[in-house]
């Protein structure tokens, strides 16, 4: 029991220091963070919790539950950087807890429970998303909860089994309310083959309908309400966000079928070189129900997502919890047997590559500086690379003693990296910091204009105003701009002179422009030259 308290305290400390502490110390990244911050803020201010709007325009790409939780964070902690990101951090923290609980349920081995949670929360991809405001950490939580509850359900009896199936239904419902039908597809393609293999299909047919009914009950009130408020919602959401993205020739974010294979390796850094021993042991134990379930959970969603034409890196987040458990199982078995070779190789290779990265940074900085008069940023970058090198080197030198140290390097990375980035990156990717520096002047403007959706949403969130006029840009807002009741929210090139003249006659005009591409420079040239810049 003492070791469990110690392990829990260590994981909680890591959560507080690595996940929560950095949330409020760097600007919102475009396009995701500014988008989700603004949509959820608009829900808070407008009171419309049914149909999502992005800068006052209909935005039907996702259901509202993810926005609700981000809005809750802003309501409780303030409309600030911490409030925008807290939902992602807590969602990831709860997924870490689920990894710990599932490992305990499967193996009843405190060391494997701790290793499962530690590996999962130090996977670079998981840790990075914990401090990033988007919907994937929330969706991953609901998917993880669905499958963990399923495992509890099929290993329980009587009332405990009914409670577990109820949790399956609630989690499926909330997953659907966060990202749509994928929340039902992923559990189905895992649980059905597993129960068939276990020859327990009758049990699934007996209790599965309970979860289905509860999931529908969770979703139905909102589904009916949004249909009444926005009759076109379901057509757009189903066909555009599901069918076209999955199978359309012009699918958004199109990638080749093998896209997720190298990404899976990168996602589990700094533990990637443990994958060979992980898969070797998993294959040897594939006839065991627990290993088979975890393999199905890892492989089948990965295959399903690979079939989709549209792919984003964060889609594989639900595959990482079972990978962490399989890896923890192999790692602890190696530790128990005194076999440190895989850990030694992992540590040495990580340390060597990071040290080479440190040398490359120094060389580039001397030849063609990446950091221009930014000694603190450069120092932090050196600290990050040095810390990663040392923690992994110690694992390589004494793998059986310092096996967990790469996790410290991973957490150091996510704490310091945002503050270690060059100003060129920060200014380009976090425009809300520029808006914050000029907030007083911009807040006094009657009209606001931008040629970039990321900058526009940052401006909208900082000033708590959805009425930003979009100059020659539309992108993901093309659908929302097509409604007749929002005409005038967009200005094309040929109409900018008339718009500026009219806007100036009504008060001050604030403009945030991006000027890197030839098209953007042309847009800048069309603006009046007599304005303050």
Curated annotation (Swiss-Prot):
Record's subcellular location: Cell inner membrane
EC nos: 2.4.2.43
Chief location bin: membrane
Membrane topology: Multi-pass membrane protein
Pathway note: Lipopolysaccharide metabolism; 4-amino-4-deoxy-beta-L-arabinose-lipid A biosynthesis
Domain of life: Bacteria
Listed GO biological process terms: lipid A biosynthetic process; lipopolysaccharide biosynthetic process; protein O-linked glycosylation; response to iron(III) ion
Top-tier EC class: transferase
Pfam families in alphabetical order: PMT (PF02366)
Biological function: Catalyzes the transfer of the L-Ara4N moiety of the glycolipid undecaprenyl phosphate-alpha-L-Ara4N to lipid A. The modified arabinose is attached to lipid A and is required for resistance to polymyxin and cationic antimicrobial peptides.
HAMAP family: ArnT_transfer
Membrane-spanning segments: 10-30, 64-84, 86-106, 113-133, 137-157, 170-190, 207-227, 257-277, 290-310, 312-332, 345-365, 377-397, 402-422
Signal peptide: none
PANTHER family membership: MANNOSYLTRANSFERASE YKCB-RELATED, UNDECAPRENYL PHOSPHATE-ALPHA-4-AMINO-4-DEOXY-L-ARABINOSE ARABINOSYL TRANSFERASE
Name of the protein in question: Undecaprenyl phosphate-alpha-4-amino-4-deoxy-L-arabinose arabinosyl transferase
Family: Belongs to the glycosyltransferase 83 family.
MF (Gene Ontology): 4-amino-4-deoxy-L-arabinose transferase activity; mannosyltransferase activity
Entry keyword set: Cell inner membrane, Cell membrane, Glycosyltransferase, Lipid A biosynthesis, Lipid biosynthesis, Lipid metabolism, Lipopolysaccharide biosynthesis, Membrane, Transferase, Transmembrane, Transmembrane helix
Lineage, highest ranks first: Bacteria, Pseudomonadati, Pseudomonadota, Gammaproteobacteria, Pseudomonadales
Assigned GO CC terms: plasma membrane
Catalyzed chemical reaction(s): 4-amino-4-deoxy-alpha-L-arabinopyranosyl di-trans,octa-cis-undecaprenyl phosphate + lipid IVA = lipid IIA + di-trans,octa-cis-undecaprenyl phosphate
Organism, scientific name: Pseudomonas savastanoi pv. phaseolicola (strain 1448A / Race 6)
């Amino acid at each position: 029991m003492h070791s469990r308290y110690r392990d829990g305290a260590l994981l909680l400390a890591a959560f507080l220091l690595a996940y929560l502490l950095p949330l409020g110390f760097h600007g919102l990244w475009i396009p995701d963070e500014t988008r989700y911050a603004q949509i959820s803020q608009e829900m808070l201010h407008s009171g419309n919790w049914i149909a999502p709007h992005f800068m006052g325009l209909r935005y039907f790409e996702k259901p509202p539950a993810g926005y609700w939780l981000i809005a809750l964070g802003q309501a409780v902690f303030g409309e600030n950087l911490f409030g925008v990101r807290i939902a992602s951090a807590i969602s990831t923290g709860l997924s870490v807890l689920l990894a710990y609980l599932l490992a305990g349920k499967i193996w009843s081995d405190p060391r494997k429970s701790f290793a499962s949670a530690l590996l999962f929360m130090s996977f670079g991809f998981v840790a990075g998303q914990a401090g990033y405001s988007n919907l994937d950490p929330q969706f991953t939580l609901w998917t993880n909860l669905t499958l963990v509850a399923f495992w509890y359900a099929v290993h329980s009896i009587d009332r405990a089994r009914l409670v577990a199936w109820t949790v399956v239904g609630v989690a499926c419902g909330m997953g659907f309310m966060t990202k749509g039908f994928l929340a039902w597809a992923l559990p189905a393609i895992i649980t059905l083959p597993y129960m068939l293999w276990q020859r327990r299909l009758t049990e699934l047919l007996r209790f599965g309908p309970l979860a289905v009914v509860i999931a529908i009950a969770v979703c139905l009130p909102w589904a009916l309400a949004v249909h009444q408020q926005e009759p076109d919602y379901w057509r757009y959401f189903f066909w555009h966000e599901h069918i076209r993205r999955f199978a359309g020739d012009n699918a958004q974010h199109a990638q080749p079928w093998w896209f997720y294979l190298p990404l899976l390796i990168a996602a589990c850094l700094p533990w990637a070189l443990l994958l060979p021993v992980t898969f070797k042991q998993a294959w040897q134990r594939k006839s065991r129900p627990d290993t088979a379930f975890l393999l199905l959970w890892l492989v089948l969603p990965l295959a399903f997502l690979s079939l989709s034409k549209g792919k984003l890196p964060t889609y594989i987040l639900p595959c990482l919890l079972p990978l962490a458990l399989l890896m923890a199982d192999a790692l602890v078995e190696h530790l128990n047997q005194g076999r440190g070779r895989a850990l030694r190789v992992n540590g040495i290779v990580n340390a060597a590559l990071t040290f080479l990265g440190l040398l490359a940074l120094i060389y580039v900085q001397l030849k063609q500086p990446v950091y221009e008069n930014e000694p603190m940023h450069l120092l932090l970058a050196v600290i990050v690379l040095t810390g990663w090198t040392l923690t992994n080197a110690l694992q390589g030198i004494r793998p059986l003693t310092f096996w967990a140290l790469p996790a410290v390097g991973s957490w150091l990375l996510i704490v310091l990296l945002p503050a270690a980035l060059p100003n060129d990156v920060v200014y380009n990717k976090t425009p809300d910091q520029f808006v914050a520096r000029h907030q007083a002047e911009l807040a006094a403007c009657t009209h606001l204009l931008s040629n970039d959706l990321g900058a526009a949403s940052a401006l909208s969130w900082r000033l708590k105003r959805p009425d930003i006029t979009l100059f020659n840009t539309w992108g993901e807002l093309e659908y929302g701009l097509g409604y007749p009741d929002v005409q005038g929210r967009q200005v094309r090139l040929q109409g900018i002179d008339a718009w500026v003249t009219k806007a100036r006659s009504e008060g001050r005009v604030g403009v945030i422009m991006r000027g890197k591409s030839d098209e953007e420079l042309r847009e800048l040239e069309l603006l009046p030259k007599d304005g303050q810049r």
